[in-house]
């Protein structure tokens, strides 16, 4: 994999459009003609452009990631819930960020804080320990 990342400016130049237009096409925002969308997408493909989702999430103050904290990922129930949740949220355009905390309150809190710092759109809990609780300060 090349260390020379293709920039949005290069995509815009290749497609013959503005950087703003490329950004709008990539974000599915605004009213862009089908021909322009096709040109931008062709340039993205031709140049191998990969959108930096972390940067886009910072700009939009949103995330396409949902966190799921489990007690034990090897538990059949947890595995089934994970599979079902993953399938459902992917249909909504989200991806799953999975963490396992066991019975440790400290690890549970660490998982929640890590997910929050990563900017997840939400956090779900499944089969966490009965004594685990979230202390929000």
Curated annotation (Swiss-Prot):
Residue ranges annotated for the HTH lacI-type domain, each copy included: 6-60
Keywords recorded for this protein, A-Z: DNA-binding, Repressor, Transcription, Transcription regulation
GO molecular function, one term: DNA-binding transcription factor activity
Superkingdom of the organism of origin: Bacteria
InterPro entries registered for this protein in UniProt: HTH_LacI, Lambda_DNA-bd_dom_sf, Peripla_BP/Lac1_sug-bd_dom, Peripla_BP_I
Residues in the DNA-binding region annotation: 8-27
Pfam hit, one: LacI
DNA-binding recorded as keyword: yes
Listed SMART domains: HTH_LACI
PANTHER family: HTH-TYPE TRANSCRIPTIONAL REPRESSOR PURR-RELATED, LACI-RELATED TRANSCRIPTIONAL REPRESSOR
Record's function text: Repressor for the malX and malY genes.
Name recorded for this polypeptide: Maltose regulon regulatory protein MalI
Name of the coding gene: malI
């Amino acid at each position: 994999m090349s260390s020379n990342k293709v920039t949005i400016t290069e995509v815009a130049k290749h497609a013959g459009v503005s950087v703003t237009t490329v950004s709008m096409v990539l974000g599915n925002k605004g009213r862009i003609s089908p021909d322009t969308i096709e040109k931008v997408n062709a340039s993205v493909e031709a140049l191998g452009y990969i959108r930096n989702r972390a940067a886009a999430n910072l700009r939009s103050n949103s995330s396409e990631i949902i966190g799921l904290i489990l007690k034990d990922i090897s538990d059949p129930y947890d595995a089934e819930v994970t599979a079902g949740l993953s399938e459902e949220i992917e249909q909504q355009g989200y991806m799953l960020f999975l963490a396992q905390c066991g019975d440790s309150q400290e690890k549970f809190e660490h998982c929640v804080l890590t997910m929050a710092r990563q900017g997840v759109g939400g956090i779900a809990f499944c089969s966490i320990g009965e004594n685990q609780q979230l202390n929000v300060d």
